[in-house]
Amino acid sequence: MYTMAFDIRIGTYKLCMIDKVEIHRSVELLADTAVITLPASEYNHALQVEDKLKRGDKVIITLGYEEAGLETEFEGWLQRISTDGGNVKLYCEDDIFLFRKDMKNEVLQKVALKDLLAKVVSECGLSFKVECSYSWTYGKFVINNATGYDVLKKVQEECGADIYLQDETLHIHPPGEKMGVECFYDFALNVEEDNLTYHRAEDKKVQVIVKALMPDGTVKEVETGATGGDKIEIKCATNDEPSMKARGELEVKRRSFDGYDGSITGWLIPVCRPSDSVTLHDADYPYKDGTYFVTAVDTEFSSAGGKRKVSLGFRLS
């Protein structure tokens, strides 16, 4: 039997009472987020936090079991406080919060992606390093009434990359290029519930149409995948054919494979993060065993227990 424990600090305060903590982390979204729900009252007195906590306060959430130790599940910043609905909710965002600063309007000509990212970091007054796996150059990139966050979001939408912050570094990589640790889940041991569907690749045919804007205003298209499958249209930041084809093949890989779609839910152990790999074992159906890239993890901590929902991406092996 494990004893649940937490250590949550916001600004100069340490929380002693909580109703629930919900943390969402994903390689497919720019920001990791957390929502801390506090009781509306303490010892029959309304809980007053708005005069103690403020937007921009540092947030560190550590959760776990006394017997196994606590893990830092989230680090970020307090974004806003809500007192609606009979309780107090603290909405938090990871270091992407620091990029929500206005950038000057500018039209950049022939700017390399890594240089663009370095410019975003600099204009937001930050000192993050940039680690970028892509080498393409934008013919033209327009910044108009945008924040650093808006620019990063546009880049992510156009290239389909994983963009995230880790160890004072802004990372941008193709999905699955940077892997974390391997986690093991056995349906008979540490999976509380699952929402999984097993598919064959031939049943999930996908045709990806990659579109890119040419200098003369026309749109260039490159098709990848299987004809007759579900058609998906995506944008590409560059208009050279190899880059467009690679972008399309990446999307096909994400969507078409023999394996599971969906998620599994376990407990706080093992610790699993987005970009980790998860190996699933089912003694009843060993042919379905496989290793998957983790795209998202939702962690919930309350009086009902600690749960971790792990969302599976493409199959690794």
Where are these regions (language model features)?
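Assembly/oligomerization scaffold segments
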Residues: 1-98
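Well-ordered beta-strand positions in beta-sheet-rich domains
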Residues: 20, 73-77, 89, 105, ...
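Short, ordered beta-strand-loop transition motifs
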Residues: 23-32, 81-86, 165-167, 255-258, ...
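Acidic, small/polar-enriched beta strand-loop surface segments
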Residues: 1-10, 153, 165-255, 261-304, ...
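Short, surface-exposed secondary-structure edge patches
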Residues: 48-53, 133, 267-271, 301
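Extended Gly/Ser/Thr-rich low-complexity repeat segments
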Residues: 46-58, 102-109, 276-281
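Charged- and aromatic-enriched interaction segments used to assemble
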Residues: 84-190, 197
